[in-house]
A protein has these predicted regions:
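Exported/periplasmic ABC-transporter solute-binding proteins
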Residues: 1-199
Length: 199
């Protein structure tokens, strides 16, 4: 804890933006939801892991379904599963290709990697460029599905809900035990010499 300093946390510029801005010296400390690559560390960046947070498969509150499995999620983004259990048409939302959300899904959901590449190349679904935009779009779009972190869900209680994944609820116990496998690792990113204010 430091006294005498004012901490300002601006709106999210995303992991890619935070890494770029930190590397270029525009900000002293960035927040990222993935670890640095070897190329990024070679450019003089360092990281400190500070938290893990659940990644929710989230839907607009109009969706009656409560659970998805890996196969159903892949089918939705492949355009093969087109309706919810009440017959309403699925509206799938994507994050832009370089977003850390996609890295997590490709590692943890078998088959999602090839479907994502095809989906983005064909521009099949609406693509969002920030977590805030994803959350707002989910909240106002009936029958929509997308991806948001656990902290964001609290902002739209009653408008957006998390689905169970493979029958497992996203909560602290299941994240800690590894039963719920979709989670973001959060890092502070900084240049080799950290300012006193940033420390």
């Amino acid at each position: 804890r430091q006294s005498g300093y004012k901490l300002e946390i601006p709106g999210s510029i995303g992991t890619t933006g935070a890494i770029k801005a930190t590397r270029e010296g525009a900000i002293p400390l960035g927040l990222a939801s993935r670890a640095l690559t070897l190329d990024e560390t070679a450019q003089g960046l360092k990281q400190i892991h500070y938290a893990s947070i659940g990644l929710a498969i989230a839907v607009n509150s109009s969706v009656p379904d409560m659970d998805l499995d890996n196969n159903a999620l892949v089918q939705i983004y492949a355009g093969e599963k087109t309706a919810w259990s009440n017959g309403a048409s699925v509206v799938a939302l994507c994050m832009y290709e370089a977003d850390s959300t996609n890295d997590i899904l490709q590692k943890q959901v078998p088959g999602f990697s090839s479907v994502l590449k095809t989906t983005l190349a064909r521009n099949d679904w609406r693509t969002l460029y920030s977590d805030g935009a994803m959350l707002e779009t989910l909240a106002k779009t009936p029958n929509a599905i997308g991806f948001v972190d656990a902290a964001a869900l609290a902002e739209k209680t009653g408008f957006v809900k998390a689905l169970k994944m493979n029958g497992i609820e996203m909560n602290f116990e299941n994240l800690s035990s590894g039963g719920y496998r979709l989670k973001k690792e959060l890092f502070f990113i900084y240049r080799e010499k950290l300012s006193d204010e940033a420390k």
